[in-house]
Amino acid sequence: MAVGRLVVMSALLVTAACRAPMPKGVEAVGLGGRALTSPALPPAIEADRLSKLASARSDLQRAPEDRDRWIWVGRRLGYLGRYREAIALYTEALERWPGDPFLLRHRGHRYLSVRAFDAAVDDLAAAARACRRVLDEVEPDGLPVPGRPPHSSLHFNVYYHLALAHFVQGEMQAAVDAWLRCLACSDDDESRVAVTHWLWCARIRSGDLAGAAATVQGVTVDMDVVENTAYHQLCLLYKGARTRDQLTAGEGSSGAAMRFGLAHHALVVGDRDQGEAALRALAADAGWASFGVIAAEAEVARAFTPLPTRDPR
């Protein structure tokens, strides 16, 4: 069996598992068969998020005709790691607003979280088609960074998550195409470095070494990046302005992004043993909903192929 099909088969098994009843606390099954349980949050953070969920539910009860109130309940569920509940809620909302790109974008994101990649592609591709008829608008930030305005938009999020869904299934050219569309929606440095990181990865894996080099050409040290510093530093690594030894991974989703970028870079520049070991370790990480961990799982499932034919440095 071709190794390129392994991640697809794993995703199909996971999708089937997503439709089946899960034990209490289990949100999904990882591509390697690991039971993925709701994360344990620090008590103060959990209490705050539960309070905000209760408030969002109350708002929805008062005005169920307001689509945005459905979205906020789904987002609040997601911040608590209750992804299957969020998916069910978005599905109910889509019965009221069929084909709504905002609802499809959020449900597609949560399908990604639970490893239902085919369902994610279906939702996000439908959202992308709907975006052709809908003006772009900035989305409010559910977990804002103090002093930083929201910067991602509907169109950005649709193409970003669609590209990631293709990437984790090994569909590199489709991922490149979606991230290029996403880059066209990016008008700030925070967004640009996030897209540039993934676009570089997809172009490298598709064998487009010249395209990968061109992707990071415009990245500079002095870009206005506060939130996505891991992506920024990784882009400088890809450009040759940093070495892996100079970069350190922190905690949380940002740390997972850095760990994936470092491991993936090691893999594609020829340090295969180091890259594979780091990706296997990341694939087993407790922070399983982060994109870095999802991408690492996918790399392990597809046995780390395909690889470029020569050193991209």
Predicted regions and their residues:
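Short coil turns that delineate tetratricopeptide repeat
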Residues: 64, 98, 132, 153, ...
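Residue-level recognition of tetratricopeptide repeat
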Residues: 75, 109, 164, 201-203, ...
